[in-house]
From Swiss-Prot:
Domain of life from the UniProt record: Bacteria
Pfam families: Guanylate_kin
Enzyme class, broadest EC rank: transferase
Name the record gives this protein: Guanylate kinase
HAMAP family cross-referenced by the UniProt entry: Guanylate_kinase
Gene3D superfamilies per UniProt: Guanylate Kinase phosphate binding domain, P-loop containing nucleotide triphosphate hydrolases
Listed GO MF terms: ATP binding; guanylate kinase activity
Family: Belongs to the guanylate kinase family.
GO cellular component: cytosol
Gene (name only): gmk
Function field: Essential for recycling GMP and indirectly, cGMP.
Length: 216
């Protein structure tokens, strides 16, 4: 009887970054709404919960002592201190979801993504690009929450961040959210078909199959 090829059912870690205004959040939201096997990682933080925020949904809220203990236990894929509070991506919860066959999205900044890349070598790193710098500028202006000074700061930062695109596996130009989502879906499908994501018994099962056909 023909043996089945056993595939690795482990999920794929998808790390998404890009400059402010590139549309990362909108793309991630669309992916989550469209696919029930894609989940977003919930970050941990030591800051106080805001009104309406739920522990384990918006963030994992920790004390500074708890956070530092997790750092000591190497339980973060990446972490940083921002304005006196700690933020990080819990390694154990991400690994649990991946082991359950769930595809996990990390929407994080570039520095965080590069730290994750050091630990998660099998991750898929996708950089979201705007169709043009002028379009990026207009998107940020439309938010209506930026002063001329902060707008210029964000724009200069975006120029610097785009230089990091070569550190990623893929670049997706977001000129249309639907098209950008389709490109990421294609990337995920291709990654699922990579030989190195199949279990080591792939060749063994094929050898057994050939042996059965030749000698049985």
């Amino acid at each position: 009887m023909m043996n089945k090829i056993h595939k690795d059912n482990r999920g794929v870690l998808i790390v998404i970054s890009g400059p402010s205004g590139a549309g990362k959040g909108t793309i991630c939201k669309a992916l989550l709404e469209k696919h029930d096997d894609i989940f977003i990682s919930v970050s941990a933080t030591t800051r106080n919960p805001r009104v309406g925020e739920v522990d384990g949904v918006n963030y994992h809220f920790l004390t500074k002592e708890e956070f530092k203990q997790r750092i000591a236990e190497d339980d973060f894929l990446e972490h940083a201190e921002v304005y006196g509070n700690y933020y990080g991506t819990p390694k154990s919860s991400v690994e649990k979801m991946l082991d359950e066959g769930k595809n996990v999205i990390l929407e994080i900044d570039i520095q965080g993504a590069l730290k994750v890349k050091e630990k998660a070598t099998d991750g898929v790193f996708i950089f979201i690009l705007p169709p043009s710098m002028e379009e990026l500028k207009q998107r940020i202006i439309k938010r209506g929450s930026e002063t001329p000074e902060s707008l210029m700061t964000r724009f200069k930062s975006a120029y610097k961040e785009i230089n990091y695109v070569s550190k990623y596996n893929y670049a997706v130009v977001n000129d249309n959210v639907e098209d950008a989502v389709k490109k990421i879906e294609a990337i995920l499908l291709a990654e699922k078909c990579r030989v190195d994501r199949l279990k080591e018994n792939l060749l063994e099962s094929k050898e057994d199959e050939m042996h059965e056909q030749l000698y049985d």
